[in-house]
């Protein structure tokens, strides 16, 4: 825990907030505050009623950009730490309250779809607009955002932008940073900044990227404009094959993508991970999955190329209907989260992921190194019930790798993080960096990968540090996220 540097006591903070927003916008219920002190990084502790992060002073539900500006200006003047949030789907501790008497600033009530511009193919929404609602609205018009993370039923736009998120159709549509046209954000001193909506410009550095991916450590995203695309769901074609090893699967992904084709889905599952999804047909092999999407002529050409590449490698064809049925049930909504909570209570068992990225030459070596180190060095390896991985987002220059690990928990709930999650996370991050990859692909640094932030950025860290000094000199924005700070997450290294 980090002590508050504010001269105000928590009661004084709450009293002052009540002069800035209406009383019904302030929540001080103890259970709500405890739940607001963590995110899904500590899901096992939370489900057992253990909240070891400092309890926030209050949750403030902003209803306008002006609310956000006034709350931040107050916090900045009085040195009160603020944790921004919207959909609460974070998984890396970015929503954890590391500082005593933090104010959690919630944008979920700012949920309007402001404009749908079919001529210029863009939609403008407030930070709390649920992605599922936006997508459903667009689908009625024959359009799509193309953004479909597994958190889609729960995620909201402010968090999607702030964490630099990505969706399951990224190989075709891109990640959130490829979709954002313009946005509005509020900085700690209450300054409202708008980046205008233009298709492209050459007017200095692209300042959208000061805001995109800032994880609430620099500013609060209040409004977003993203591209939209025409949607042709009836044209989708599904392809899959079984292959003998990850190296073959990686090469198949690479050949399709670098050949100039953009299937919306391009995935590779290790045998262990495949068994979680495809046990009815995977037979202990790796599974390669593609979805061709778009206008009929593009789908036909993409499908032909996928089949051509498959035929260059030993493989067993998988029936398309099996993949279509699987893909229709990938997203995580409230029902799956409640089922996971029930399982954690009853079985003391847990599953997590850590995702990295690397070039085509390195990703296989990273995968092999992680598998070897976890199996030979991780002290609790005997508690693992599954260790595997999958690639789900590919590029001209490389791909990502999700490491997936499930384990039985043989300790008190309060000890789970340190015994299991932190050391497994560390091995994956270390191997990604050792091989020249990135320690995080799309979940954000949060508060538990900060020990490696300097190693991730190297000499470019000075630029990142300069942004913090310029925009948050008082250090009130989500302390301990992105930027390593003693007392937040785990101890800084090096």
Residue spans for each PLM region:
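Conserved, mostly hydrophobic/aromatic
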Residues: 75, 216, 472
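N-terminal flexible segment immediately upstream of the FAD-binding catalytic core
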Residues: 1-73, 91-121, 271-280, 325-351, ...
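C-terminal substrate-recognition/cap domain of FAD-linked oxidoreductases
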Residues: 27-43, 250-427, 435
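Activity-critical C-terminal alpha-helical subdomain
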Residues: 445-494
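FAD-binding subdomain of flavoenzyme oxidoreductases
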Residues: 111-267, 491-494
């Amino acid at each position: 825990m980090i002590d508050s540097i504010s001269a105000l006591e928590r009661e004084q903070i709450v009293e002052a907030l009540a002069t800035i927003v209406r009383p019904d916008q302030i929540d001080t219920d103890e259970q709500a505050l405890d739940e607001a002190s963590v995110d899904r990084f500590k899901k096992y502790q939370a489900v057992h009623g253990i909240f070891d992060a400092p309890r926030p002073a209050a949750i403030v539900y902003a209803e306008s950009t002006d609310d956000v500006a006034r709350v931040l200006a107050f916090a900045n003047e009085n040195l009160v730490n603020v944790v921004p949030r919207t959909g609460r789907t974070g998984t890396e501790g970015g929503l954890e309250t590391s500082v005593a008497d933090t104010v959690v600033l919630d944008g979920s009530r700012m949920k309007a779809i402001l404009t749908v511009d079919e001529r210029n193919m863009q939609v403008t929404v407030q930070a709390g607009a649920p992605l599922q609602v936006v997508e459903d609205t667009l689908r009625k018009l024959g359009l799509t955002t193309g953004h479909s993370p597994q958190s889609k039923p729960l995620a909201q736009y402010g968090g999607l932008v702030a964490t630099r998120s990505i969706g399951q159709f990224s190989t075709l549509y891109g990640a959130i940073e490829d979709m954002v046209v313009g946005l509005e954000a509020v900085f700690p001193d209450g300054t409202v900044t708008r980046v205008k909506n233009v298709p492209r410009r050459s007017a200095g550095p692209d300042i959208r990227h000061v805001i995109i991916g800032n994880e609430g450590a620099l500013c609060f995203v209040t409004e977003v404009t993203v591209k939209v695309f025409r949607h042709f769901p009836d044209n989708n074609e599904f392809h899959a094959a079984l292959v003998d090893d990850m190296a073959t699967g990686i090469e198949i992904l690479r050949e399709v993508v670098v050949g100039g084709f953009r299937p919306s889905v391009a995935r590779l599952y290790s045998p262990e991970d495949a068994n979680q999804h495809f046990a009815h047909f995977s037979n202990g092999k790796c599974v390669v999955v593609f979805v061709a999407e778009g206008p009929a002529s593009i789908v036909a050409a993409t499908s032909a190329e996928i089949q051509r590449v498959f035929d260059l490698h030993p493989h067993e064809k998988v029936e398309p209907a099996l993949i279509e049925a699987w893909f229709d049930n990938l997203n995580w909504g409230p029902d799956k989260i409640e089922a996971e909570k029930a399982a954690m209570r009853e079985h003391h068992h847990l599953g997590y992921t850590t995702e990295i990225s690397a070039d085509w030459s390195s990703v296989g070596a990273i995968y092999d190194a992680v598998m070897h180190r976890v199996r030979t060095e991780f002290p609790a390896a005997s508690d693992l019930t599954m260790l595997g991985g999958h690639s789900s987002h590919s590029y001209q220059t490389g791909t990502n790798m999700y490491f997936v690990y499930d384990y039985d928990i043989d300790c008190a709930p309060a000890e789970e993080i340190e015994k299991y999650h932190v050391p497994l996370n560390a091995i994956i991050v270390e191997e990604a960096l050792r091989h020249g990859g990135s320690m995080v692909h799309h979940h954000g640094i949060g508060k538990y990968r900060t020990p490696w932030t300097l190693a991730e950025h190297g000499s470019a860290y000075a630029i990142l540090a300069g942004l913090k000094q310029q925009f948050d000199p008082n250090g009130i924005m989500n302390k301990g996220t992105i930027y390593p700070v003693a007392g937040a997450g785990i101890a800084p290294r090096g």
